[in-house]
């Protein structure tokens, strides 16, 4: 039957990408339908019970700055919070949280059920409705046909998924869930370029059978307790729990080696490529043969379960080998396995067949997000889902897409890497992938993106008000520090020595004092009995006050580096964002080699910047392209139109601070 209501956007899949996509399009006012094979698994953490980490935490903060749900749900469900790289510079500091699976899933579902303009429907999707070169809806497994102007496909590992435990295998999207076989076949009929990838998960362990007295305890950060959302509070966190650390040993490695003849990875049964930065324990033993031990983190799955996730032993070895390798580790000698580990092999589609909006080039209105694009990780999926949801909503509203730049957000880096370079293995975000990471910090994600989110319609009044109070306070206080001066006469020598190590010998602004190593904002404001502090509190709320102080300190201490990077962004921006016409035939560009013109015609980059990052492109080829565009009066700056964010420049110094 044809469902009587037509929607603006249909989202297929209720994982981390799908939930963010549905919430984003609905926040924009688009009538949105979220189709899932099981409403009870909305927002489910299919693998590890954690959110964030290096690069990943940056994405979560950006999703939050744009009104997304992941950070807030983590604050409500997080049972341990830590700041990674806390002793290093602000560019690489990252938040990571262990999450209670049940509480996290409840927080996501609560937001979905209370979001205006969003409808839920439980049915697996078997087919897409395509008319000509555009998608017009989706068909469920019992034949219900839903029409929409745009469809976002977030199928995760479900497309023709195959689960492997040893040499045994069966179809499945994840343990306990069916694979999307019909939908996978339908997508192949559309001639979208696809391949196979694989990922894996470790066996789960009953905490009642772990000897914690033999393990090293790893508590979370307590002073202060981190929060993920810019609107979050530590008081939202439930009870906090420690993680525990054990190690593999030579006996463990011998057990693993003895089972490789029954490993689907090492017998050619699995053809898909696995994630380089989250390898199976089989891969670790093989690739790092000289190491006699690997660290294993035992992570609690929640407050109401005894289940532990042994992070570091993802495996598809036969169950008897899994049991033996677990029992070989300190503290796990009597451990009971609740669920066996497994590998899952699934279809993905070459992201080079996508526009930067995550819309497929071949089929108008069809957007892909998450693992279907060859990425790995909840955070990468959520970020893509948010962007796809925004652009699906804008497509339905007949507005131009928003495509964040590499200098604007890690989300821009992620998407640009995918659509220009493609993937040969599951893609994971790291800070090292960003050229401008000093400008793309966790702490300033809201300064970079919340104003854009407001223009896009995904930032509500509460977030907008908090952001403006923070931004205004940072601006006012930074200016006060730059224009307030102390001299040897007005600053007592003993106070200067206590703060700076010696008396001052000439006039300094408070900002110049703050720029010195080891000097804090509170230290400067405490000079002269507190007279150097602001006349009024910067904020009544303690969390907001801490965020304001952090922005002020980083902005002043790193001012020179930030301004230098802003200049680099401006210099590179002219060519980086120059658009390439949609219909250009690169064989007609004089001087281009056949190989280069063939690649350009195949991948159809949207900008000169994207073209420059295609494998095999040379500076000479880029110069020839620029000459071709100039001669024919083609090309314009990407973002030089009415797209939100075009006038919110990432090189604005205030936004970087």
Curated annotation (Swiss-Prot):
Pfam families reported for this sequence: GIDA (PF01134), GIDA_C_1st (PF21680), SAM_GIDA_C (PF13932)
Requisite cofactors: FAD
Subcellular location: Cytoplasm
Record-linked Gene3D superfamilies: FAD/NAD(P)-binding domain, GidA associated domain, C-terminal subdomain, tRNA uridine 5-carboxymethylaminomethyl modification enzyme MnmG/GidA
GO molecular function: flavin adenine dinucleotide binding
Protein residues bound to NAD(+): 274-288
Claim: Flavoprotein is one of the keywords in the record: yes
Keywords: Cytoplasm, FAD, Flavoprotein, NAD, tRNA processing
Gene Ontology BP terms: tRNA methylation; tRNA wobble uridine modification
Lineage top rank: taxon: Bacteria
Major subcellular location class: cytoplasm
Region: Disordered, residue numbers: 636-657
InterPro entries recorded: FAD/NAD-bd_sf, GIDA_C_N, MnmG, MnmG-rel, MnmG-rel_CS, MnmG_C, MnmG_C_subdom, MnmG_C_subdom_sf
Annotated PROSITE patterns: GIDA_1, GIDA_2
Binding site for FAD: 13-18
Cellular component GO terms held in the UniProt record: cytosol
Family under the similarity heading: Belongs to the MnmG family.
Physiological role: NAD-binding protein involved in the addition of a carboxymethylaminomethyl (cmnm) group at the wobble position (U34) of certain tRNAs, forming tRNA-cmnm(5)s(2)U34.
Subunit relationships: Homodimer. Heterotetramer of two MnmE and two MnmG subunits.
NCBIfam families, per the entry: mnmG_gidA
HAMAP family named in the record: MnmG_GidA
Name of the protein described by the UniProt record: tRNA uridine 5-carboxymethylaminomethyl modification enzyme MnmG
Gene: mnmG
């Amino acid at each position: 039957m044809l469902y009587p209501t037509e929607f603006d956007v249909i989202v297929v899949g209720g994982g981390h990408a799908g939930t963010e996509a549905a919430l984003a399009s609905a926040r924009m006012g688009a009538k949105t339908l979220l189709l899932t094979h099981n409403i009870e698994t909305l927002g489910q953490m299919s693998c590890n019970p954690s959110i964030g980490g290096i690069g990943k935490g940056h994405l979560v903060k950006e999703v939050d700055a744009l009104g997304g749900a992941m950070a807030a749900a983590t604050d409500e469900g997080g049972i341990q919070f830590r700041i990674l790289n806390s002793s290093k510079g602000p560019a690489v500091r990252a938040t990571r949280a262990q999450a209670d699976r049940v509480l996290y899933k409840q927080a996501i579902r609560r937001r979905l059920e209370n979001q205006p303009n969003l409808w839920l429907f439980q049915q697996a999707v078997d087919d897409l409705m395509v008319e000509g070169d555009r998608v017009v809806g989706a068909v469920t497994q019992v034949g219900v046909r839903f029409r929409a102007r745009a469809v976002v496909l977030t199928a995760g590992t479900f497309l023709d998924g195959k689960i492997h435990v040893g040499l045994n295998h069966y179809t499945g999207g994840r343990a306990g869930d069916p694979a999307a076989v019909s939908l996978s076949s339908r997508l192949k009929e559309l001639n979208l370029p696809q391949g196979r990838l694989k990922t894996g998960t470790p066996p789960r362990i009953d905490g009642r059978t772990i000897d914690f007295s033999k393990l090293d305890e790893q508590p979370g950060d307590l002073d202060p307790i981190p929060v993920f959302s810019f609107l979050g509070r530590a008081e939202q966190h439930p009870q906090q729990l420690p993680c525990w650390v054990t190690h593999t040993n030579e006996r463990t490695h011998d057990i693993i080696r003895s089972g490789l003849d029954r490993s689907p990875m090492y017998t050619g049964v699995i053809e898909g490529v696995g994630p380089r930065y989250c390898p199976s324990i089989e891969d670790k033993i093989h690739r790092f043969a000289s190491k006699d031990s690997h660290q294993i983190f035992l992570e609690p799955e929640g407050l109401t379960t005894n289940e532990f996730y042994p992070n570091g032993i993802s495996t598809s070895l036969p169950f008897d080998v899994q049991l033996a390798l677990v029992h070989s580790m300190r503290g796990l000698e009597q451990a009971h396995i609740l669920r066996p580990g497994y590998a899952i092999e699934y279809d993905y589609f070459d992201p080079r067949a996508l526009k930067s909006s995550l819309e497929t080039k071949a089929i108008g209105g069809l957007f892909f997000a998450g693992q279907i694009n060859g990425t790995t990780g909840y955070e990468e999926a959520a970020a893509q889902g948010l962007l796809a949801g925004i652009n699906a909503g804008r497509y339905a509203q007949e507005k131009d897409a928003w495509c964040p730049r590499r200098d604007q957000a890690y989300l821009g880096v992620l998407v640009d890497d995918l659509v220009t370079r493609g993937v040969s293995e599951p893609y994971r975000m790291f800070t090292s992938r960003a050229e401008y990471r000093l400008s793309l910090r966790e702490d300033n994600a809201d300064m970079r993106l919340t104003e854009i989110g407001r223009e896009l319609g995904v930032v509500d009044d509460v977030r907008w008000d908090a952001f403006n109070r923070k931004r205004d306070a940072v601006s006012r206080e930074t200016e006060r520090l730059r224009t307030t001066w102390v001299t040897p006469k007005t600053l007592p020598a003993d106070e200067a020595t206590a703060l700076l190590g010696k008396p001052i010998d000439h006039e300094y602004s408070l900002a110049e004092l703050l720029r010195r190593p080891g000097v804090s904002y509170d230290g400067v404001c405490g000079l002269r009995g507190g007279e150097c502090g602001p006349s009024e509190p910067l904020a009544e709320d303690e969390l907001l006050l801490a965020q304001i102080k952090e922005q002020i300190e980083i902005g002043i201490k790193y001012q020179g580096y930030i301004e230098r990077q802003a200049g680099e962004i401006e210099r590179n921006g002219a060519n980086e964002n120059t658009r390439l016409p949609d219909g250009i035939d690169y064989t007609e560009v004089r001087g281009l080699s056949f190989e280069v013109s063939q690649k350009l015609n195949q991948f159809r980059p949207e900008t000169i910047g994207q073209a420059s990052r295609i494998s095999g492109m040379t500076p000479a080829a880029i110069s020839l392209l620029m000459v071709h565009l100039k001669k024919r009066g083609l090309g314009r700056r990407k973002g030089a139109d009415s797209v939100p964010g075009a006038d919110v420049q990432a090189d604005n110094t205030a936004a970087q601070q």
